[in-house]
């Protein structure tokens, strides 16, 4: 069996890491050891924050809904309770969008939720 020199493979691997580390500051962009560590850590942050993004957006929608229902003398929790009692199954993302872009439609939903709470 012939001897295989690893130069081509190593160069390809390094090139892949440096491409991912493009734009990093200092040695992180041009030293293989630090670049590899930085790319690995960036991947960990990306994985963690893809999960966190879902929580953050849900919290944003809830804050928007709470602010949107306050003029109707409701709190967020009472509003959601009214929605469930009236059988309206619209998620928070859509409700938040309605509150911003379609105030008339949102008002109609709030009135139905209030009616369900009163009954």
Curated annotation (Swiss-Prot):
GO biological processes: ribosomal large subunit assembly; translation
Highest rank taxon of the organism: Bacteria
Record has Ribonucleoprotein as a keyword: yes
Keyword terms of this UniProt record: Ribonucleoprotein, Ribosomal protein, RNA-binding, rRNA-binding
TM regions (residue ranges): none
InterPro entries: Ribosomal_bL20, RIBOSOMAL_L20_CS, Ribosomal_protein_bL20_C
GO terms for MF: rRNA binding; structural constituent of ribosome
CDD domains listed in its UniProt record: Ribosomal_L20 (cd07026)
GO CC terms: ribonucleoprotein complex; ribosome
Keyword rRNA-binding set for record: yes
Family: Belongs to the bacterial ribosomal protein bL20 family.
Function: Binds directly to 23S ribosomal RNA and is necessary for the in vitro assembly process of the 50S ribosomal subunit. It is not involved in the protein synthesizing functions of that subunit.
Name by which UniProt lists this protein: Large ribosomal subunit protein bL20
Organism: Bradyrhizobium sp. (strain BTAi1 / ATCC BAA-1182)
């Amino acid at each position: 069996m012939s001897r295989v020199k690893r130069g081509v493979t190593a160069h390809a691997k390094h090139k892949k890491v440096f491409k991912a580390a493009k734009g990093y500051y200092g040695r992180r962009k041009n030293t293989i050891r630090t670049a590899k560590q930085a790319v690995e850590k960036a991947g960990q942050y990306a994985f963690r924050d893809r999960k966190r993004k879902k929580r953050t957006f849900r919290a944003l929608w809830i804050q928007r809904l709470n602010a949107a229902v306050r003029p109707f003398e409701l709190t967020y929790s009472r509003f959601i309770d009214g929605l469930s009692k009236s059988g309206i199954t619209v998620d928070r993302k859509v409700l938040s969008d309605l509150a911003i872009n379609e105030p008339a439609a949102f008002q109609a939903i709030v009135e139905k939720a209030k009616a369900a709470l009163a009954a």
